[in-house]
A protein has these predicted regions:
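N-terminal intrinsically disordered, cationic/polar leader segments
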Residues: 2-111
């Protein structure tokens, strides 16, 4: 898989920040008591009531978004406008939705 859709680090950072902010907005609208989403420059974290943390962060040198949860890590490249896991070709939104759904015991669908 190629490095990503982005020609420069600045373009990657701009697009990645927009994706993270969009996800934060969706997560804020879900309004579950089981977790608290937080966005800081370059990363989005979800702190769950049981103490677990899900972290999605930008990795500028590789033009990837990295997700860590449940002792597992995923690396996403943007290909044709979609964030796809570089080893499994799964959608970032599908994986993140499944992780959150498992934690809150309800179906969550991020778009």
């Amino acid at each position: 898989m190629s490095r990503s859709d982005f020609a420069t680090d600045a373009v990657f950072r701009k697009e990645a920040e927009e994706v993270l902010e969009h996800l934060l907005q969706q997560l804020d609208e879900i309004d579950y008591d089981e977790f608290e989403p937080r966005y800081t420059s370059g990363s989005l974290s979800l702190q769950f009531d049981n103490g677990t943390v899900v972290m999605l962060s930008m990795q500028t040198p590789t033009h990837e978004l990295w997700l860590s949860a449940n002792y597992t890590a995923w690396h996403f490249l943007c290909t044709n406008g979609q964030w796809i896991e570089r080893d499994t070709s799964e959608s970032m939104l599908t994986i993140l939705s499944a992780i959150i759904s498992e934690k809150v015991l309800q179906q969550v669908h991020l778009v």
